[in-house]
């Protein structure tokens, strides 16, 4: 996929879900969804939140999720569709976002597309000291794209740390 957000003439996660929802629900109009954020091509989202404006009971929402999930390709899954308050917005109502970045110092062919492989030893004590410094800053303009509609690049980092992963040599960086 070329990331999350719908783009002309290229497969995206959002576009794939929208087509599936439209087809399965037999909607006369294309169904549009709004994601809480975006991912770039090659980035995996394990828990992307999105919203869609539909008037469904909880039972109808679960039936739509089940049927749509069966139609989606193997690499996209809908975990739930739940009714929320009318003015809820996946992007603008979010109060925090957590990102996790995975790396390994050992070869693992099963995780090759989900982890960055490092070919040298890392000092995680020093990396955690550096990560903690992120919480002292609020202006992240240096990490932002230029010439966008974003009004501010200020945010509050509440946690930033490295921890060992599920297997020897695997590490996870978490930032909220």
Regions found by a protein language model. Name each.
Residues 1-176:
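Structured-RNA-binding interfaces characteristic of tRNA pseudouridine synthases
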